[in-house]
């Protein structure tokens, strides 16, 4: 099967790069985080319209996109290599991580 056939989504982020994932990788995320199953539109919106974006404390190429998803926050973790962005994982959390907040920027 060609790689293009398994392409699930590609979302333009506020940081100026796009994030993508495949059907197979999305299935892996859903198996590891069953609370995300059926919530792909919310994850896509989190990438497109996050409440905030933070850099990972461990890896400067990793970005954590957060959006309120009461009573939790939805977190979409992405990695950017050159101009190629991809989803690492997604999950619900009670707390936003401590990484450096990079978006939105303060005036």
Locations of regions flagged by a protein language model:
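Ribonuclease/tRNase effector modules and their secretory precursors
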Residues: 1-107
């Amino acid at each position: 099967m060609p790689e293009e056939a398994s392409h699930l989504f590609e979302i333009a982020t506020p940081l100026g790069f796009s994030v993508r994932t495949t059907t197979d990788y999305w299935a892996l995320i859903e198996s590891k985080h069953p609370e995300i199953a059926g919530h792909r539109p919310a994850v896509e919106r989190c990438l497109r319209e996050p409440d905030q974006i933070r850099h990972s404390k461990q890896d400067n190429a990793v970005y954590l996109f957060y959006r309120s998803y009461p009573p939790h926050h939805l977190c979409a973790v992405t990695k950017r290599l050159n101009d190629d962005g991809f989803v690492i994982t997604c999950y619900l959390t009670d707390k936003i991580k401590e990484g450096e907040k990079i978006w939105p920027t303060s005036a």
